[in-house]
Amino acid sequence: MFNMKKSLLLLFFLGTISLSLCEEERDADEDDGVEMTEEEVKRSLLDTFKNLAVNAAKSAGVSVLNALSCKISRTC
């Protein structure tokens, strides 16, 4: 359980850094100063949440598989 919490925290941290880098890049790309529409804001938020959920699910799956393989091979 502790390993899963650590990996989820790590993924959240990396996702936050990735998100901030993407926002900086997006700000650098905007040269005319046009604001984002509501649709673009919703799309970017949904993509961010989707990516975080997918990464969390992958991490949880890897943690479960590691725990199972450890118990099966009795190397814990």
Curated annotation (Swiss-Prot):
Propeptide stretches in the record: 23-41
Keywords: Amphibian defense peptide, Antibiotic, Antimicrobial, Cleavage on pair of basic residues, Disulfide bond, Secreted, Signal
Compartments where located: Secreted
Superkingdom in the source lineage: Eukaryota
Disulphide bridges: C70-C76
Keyword Disulfide bond belongs to the record: yes
GO biological process: defense response to Gram-negative bacterium; defense response to Gram-positive bacterium
GO CC terms in record: extracellular region
Endpoints of the signal sequence: 1-22
Tissue spec: Expressed by the skin glands.
Coiled-coil ranges from the UniProt annotation: none
Family, per entry: Belongs to the frog skin active peptide (FSAP) family. Brevinin subfamily.
Function: Has antimicrobial activity against Gram-negative bacterium E.coli ATCC 8739 (MIC=50 ug), against Gram positive bacteria S.aureus ATCC 6538 (MIC=12.5 ug), methicillin-resistant S.aureus ATCC 43300 (MIC=100 ug) and B.subtilis ATCC 6633 (MIC=12.5 ug). Has no activity against fungus C.albicans ATCC 90028.
Protein name (Swiss-Prot/TrEMBL): Brevinin-2ISa
Record organism: Odorrana ishikawae (Ishikawa's frog)
